[in-house]
Amino acid sequence: MTNRYEGGDLLVEALKHLGVRQIFSVSGGVINSIYSAAATHGMCLVHTRHEAAAAFMAEAVGRQTGVPGVAAVTVGAGVTNTVTPAFVAKRAGTP
């Protein structure tokens, strides 16, 4: 059996290279490969109860540390719920 290298692995490795230590998220369908990769590569997953909370937490981490804050959300309403925190991060120049 061969080891599978998925998109989640590539993403998590790239984030680690940037200094990211945690991903804020609400678990959901199409982003499961990110969770598997995060566990494999030793990245901390912080589960929240709402996508906006995950995105605001990521923005706060970016603002306080200078390291990009990361929120992983699923398609549809998950992305829609991150519009306000993404706008705040953009206006504040948060990484």
Per-segment meaning from a language model:
Residues 1-95:
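N-terminal alpha/beta PP-like core and its mobile active-site loop of ThDP/TPP-dependent enzymes
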